[in-house]
UniProtKB/Swiss-Prot annotation:
GO CC annotation terms, alphabetical: replication fork protection complex
Protein name: Chromosome segregation in meiosis protein 3
Gene Ontology BP term (one): replication fork arrest
Free-text function comment from the UniProt entry: Forms a fork protection complex (FPC) with tof1 and which is required for chromosome segregation during meiosis and DNA damage repair. FPC coordinates leading and lagging strand synthesis and moves with the replication fork. FPC stabilizes replication forks in a configuration that is recognized by replication checkpoint sensors.
GO molecular function: DNA binding
Family from the record: Belongs to the CSM3 family.
Subunit composition and interactions: Component of the fork protection complex (FPC) consisting of tof1 and csm3.
Chain segments carrying region Disordered: 1-20, 33-61, 156-185, 195-214, 223-253
Source organism per UniProt: Neosartorya fischeri (strain ATCC 1020 / DSM 3700 / CBS 544.65 / FGSC A1164 / JCM 1740 / NRRL 181 / WB 181) (Aspergillus fischerianus)
Start-end of Basic and acidic residues biased regions: 8-20, 156-166
Length: 270
């Protein structure tokens, strides 16, 4: 059966069958109308729209291209006061910057300039070292940086604790009480007098032993007077105190002395 099928297929087609194959009713005009009008160079359909927008003058539509520009970094107050700015400079200077001192001034200055140059290069690489220093100097005159500089200076000052403050107050009060005490003031005057007397004695070419002896005698006499005043009885104190109620004035005493002198002179003449 398969052989018969192949034999039937291998048979030549009849003329009627060939006419049926090529006899199809399909219009080529309809096919060309359905397909879009594509140009020969393969340009898209937008070319017609461009021609219409250009009003047939051959001008293409202007295409506006806007580029997003990146913000340019500037060395301003905010950048200088940020963490990579002056705070980093203060923090690293305490840890890394060390000076040798006397005899190494040139090397210390070079080390300081190198330290500043590395810091400024990390902060603002666009500017040179001299230009960056000029910008920082100009920014240093602003009120914001002046206030921050004052705050940094106050932070570096030694802080006064409450205990130290109380000790200072007690010391000032004790010094004031000593100056107000009449006994202490009197002793200070006496010591000044004794020192002055010792200086005078030294000027008179006396020995130090004599000066010490005079000072001891002055101190002993003053102490003896104080002891006698302290241990004096009430009767002696009352006897030494004059009666102010019956005491004459100074003018009356002068008059009495003059009268006494006149009487003596008269008696002598007689």
């Amino acid at each position: 059966m398969e052989i018969e099928g192949t034999l039937q297929d291998d048979r030549p087609a009849s003329p009627k069958r060939a006419d049926d194959l090529f006899d199809y009713d399909f219009g080529l005009d309809e096919l060309w109308q359905e397909t879009p009008n594509m140009p020969n160079n393969g340009a898209p359909m937008q070319s017609s729209a461009r021609d219409e927008s250009g009003l047939g003058l051959g001008l293409d539509e202007e295409v506006k291209v806007t580029k997003k520009r990146q913000p340019v970094a500037k060395l301003d107050e905010s950048r200088l006061l940020s963490q990579p700015g002056i705070p980093k400079l203060r923090r690293t200077a305490k840890k890394k910057l060390r000076f040798k001192g006397k005899g190494h001034e040139f090397s210390d200055a070079a080390r300081l300039l190198n330290f500043y140059q590395l810091w400024l290069d990390d902060l603002f690489p666009r500017a040179k070292f001299a230009d960056g220093l000029a910008i920082i100097e100009r920014l240093g005159h602003s009120k914001r940086l002046q206030a921050m500089r004052k705050e940094w200076i106050d932070e570096e000052k030694p802080k006064v604790t409450s205990e130290n403050h109380n000790d200072a107050l007690q010391a000032s009060e004790s010094s004031g009480s000593r100056s107000d005490d009449p006994v202490v003031a009197f002793d200070g005057l006496n010591m000044a007098d004794t020192k002055r007397s010792r200086g005078d004695i030294a000027g008179d070419h006396t020995s130090d032993a004599e000066g010490m002896h005079i000072e001891d005698t002055l101190i002993s006499s003053r102490q003896r007077g104080l002891d006698e005043g302290l241990f004096m009885t009430e009767d002696d104190d009352a006897a030494q105190q004059p009666d102010n109620r019956g005491a004459p004035d100074d003018d009356e005493l002068d008059a009495l002395l003059k009268e006494q002198e006149l009487l003596l002179m008269n008696n002598a003449s007689a």
